[in-house]
Amino acid sequence: MIDKRDDKPFKLKSKYKPSGDQPQAIESLVDNIEGGEKAQILLGATGTGKTYTMSQVISKVNKPTLVIAHNKTLAGQLYGEFKEFFPDNAVEYFVSYYDYYQPEAYVPSSDTYIEKDSSVNDEIDKLRHSATASLLERNDVIVVASVSCIYGLGSPKEYADSAVSLRPGQEISRDTLLNQLVDIQFERNDIDFQRGCFRVRGDVVEVFPASRDEHAFRVEFFGDEIDRICEIESLTGKTIGEVDHLVLFPATHFVTNDEHMEQSIAKIQAELAEQLQLFESEGKLLEAQRLRQRTEYDIEMLREMGYTSGVENYSRHMDGRSPGEPPYTLLDFFPEDFLIMIDESHMTMGQIKGMYNGDQARKQMLVDYGFRLPSALDNRPLRREEFESHVHQIVYVSATPGEYEMSQTNTIIEQIIRPTGLLDPEIDVRPSMGQMDDLLGEINQRVARDERTFITTLTKKMAEDLTDYLKEMGVKVKYMHSDIKTLERTEIIRDLRLGVFDVLIGINLLREGIDVPEVSLVAILDADKEGFLRNERGLIQTIGRAARNVDGHVIMYADKMTDSMQRAIDETARRREIQIAYNKAHGIVPQTIKKDIRGLISISKTSHNDISKEEMDYESMSRGERKEAINALQKQMQEAAELLDFELAAQMRDLILELKLMD
């Protein structure tokens, strides 16, 4: 069993003090948590500092906390913010470690088997190991995760029990330590010393934990006793300092001992025999042969190496679970009394609900056609009700909480006041007849004031037609459609802020990262067409895009007033009234948010120009120029990964592959 370090309280460091209605929200949330309330909602309007409020709550209740976001980008932003707020505590990041992932699948209609194809991001793998190690070693831990945290991870008990604990003066031979390291999936590599490896130099063993980046450990022996343990720089070998206790966790989350492995293999073989009998009785000889060949190969690898590609598909047998029993996940690494915060809960809870069904449909096809044993179905994400069973206390955070969250609790804490004094925008409803000319007039007013405009439409055709019309009228406009990738999207937002163009048109402008303080007008076309983007929640989210500018204004073009429109307008008016009263009582003058315009990471050729597929004619390049471009792209890919922009890193990787294929 791992001895946890002495309890260390969360220590929040910030130049800000709670303001507006943050103090009331923080106090209510903390009182409810300490009073044993299971679920509550923080209903925070856009730009009110919800992350800061979450940080204050964490520091006051002092519990290990899991923060779940609905995508990697948002998780990365939150991770960065929490790291700044809690520099002395363990703030960890846990998302899917794939830069690119094509799951194993089979398409019967075309008899196409798609092999699992993936590219693992080494940095994220390190961060995942760091998260699980921190959870087992200490209590002052915040883990920011995507919904990957509800996917199977391996048994925390096996993971903890397999850990190697070392102290100076401990009696253990060098060879015994080497065998223990191999058992927990460390590799000996005396030349290329990297994460998950160890090297041996006489009576000195150097180990590079899977959870570390630049620092490794040197274990010095005197006979069959540990003489000294030092932390070292992995690159130079320079000693940083001595340590009195070192815990080495396994280099993979799926780990088991020899005895347990043989038991697991016996179960796999029994299931294989049963499934082969079923296939043969149904005359499915091809499926039977395929399953026998694949499974026997995996068994051989497990026996010889203790690991095989796709080992997670046998996790039910490895963990000793019954059929249908939920897998171990990151949630099982937390102690019983921990806090969960769901960011943008109206999106995230929907994802948690939907993960299971999509996973099962794909895997069932693999089982039916002999690519996997039925137990592979139990390597899966949690069902929503299984996730709920892990919840001790939970806070749903959203500007527009969903029906699910509202059904879980009646405790709703509002955070409506913005520290900047900014108000929710005023809203006009205008008829759709003559909307083009009316909109053009409004845009021209904004252009004259050096302000920007968002226009949201319901269809691609409408967006394209409107873009063409505004261009003919001399307006600098761009249309952001679903085919635009992360890098281009970032460039478009930057160019809008810089004034390269004045109007951005899109179908769904609710995605994170679209908060642009320069936008003073949001126009919603077809506002009376009920649906996902025109329901109350969608409208409030869209209205919030104009809440970053002191002159923020929203125009809804509609021929009738729908219930969703009325509720969104009423809710915005209610919030605006509260904000005006607060500003008046405290003498606050609203100010537009000041937000730096961040430059993009540049990919240099020699002139440091951005390289993109559209701008560079790769086919006309010489082999040397292509090699130079590949080197530049690889550097950019690493920089993007370090900045946690993994979508951009994946695009860079795809571009590199295309260039390599040209040679």
Swiss-Prot record:
GO molecular function: ATP binding; ATP hydrolysis activity; DNA binding; excinuclease ABC activity; helicase activity
Domain Helicase ATP-binding: 31-271
Domain Helicase C-terminal: 435-601
Pfam families noted in UniProt: Helicase_C (PF00271), ResIII (PF04851), UVR (PF02151), UvrB (PF12344), UvrB_inter (PF17757)
Motif Beta-hairpin, residue range(s) on this chain: 97-120
SUPFAM superfamilies per the UniProt record, alphabetical: C-terminal UvrC-binding domain of UvrB, P-loop containing nucleoside triphosphate hydrolases
Keywords on record: ATP-binding, Cytoplasm, DNA damage, DNA excision, DNA repair, Excision nuclease, Helicase, Hydrolase, Nucleotide-binding, SOS response
Biased composition (Basic and acidic residues): 1-10
Keyword Hydrolase: yes
Cell location: Cytoplasm
PROSITE patterns: HELICASE_ATP_BIND_1, HELICASE_CTER, UVR
Domain UVR residues, every copy: 627-662
Keyword Magnesium: no
Binding locations of ATP: 44-51
Superkingdom of the organism of origin: Bacteria
Alphabetical list of SMART domains matching this protein: DEXDc (SM00487), HELICc (SM00490)
GO-annotated cellular components: cytoplasm; excinuclease repair complex
GO terms classed as biological process: nucleotide-excision repair; SOS response
Location of region: Disordered: 1-23
NCBIfam families linked: PRK05298.1, uvrb
PANTHER family hit by this protein: UVRABC SYSTEM PROTEIN B
Subunit structure: Forms a heterotetramer with UvrA during the search for lesions. Interacts with UvrC in an incision complex.
Domains (record comment): The beta-hairpin motif is involved in DNA binding.
Family recorded in the similarity comment: Belongs to the UvrB family.
Function (record text): The UvrABC repair system catalyzes the recognition and processing of DNA lesions. A damage recognition complex composed of 2 UvrA and 2 UvrB subunits scans DNA for abnormalities. Upon binding of the UvrA(2)B(2) complex to a putative damaged site, the DNA wraps around one UvrB monomer. DNA wrap is dependent on ATP binding by UvrB and probably causes local melting of the DNA helix, facilitating insertion of UvrB beta-hairpin between the DNA strands. Then UvrB probes one DNA strand for the presence of a lesion.
Record protein name field: UvrABC system protein B
Source organism (scientific name): Streptococcus pyogenes serotype M2 (strain MGAS10270)
Gene: uvrB
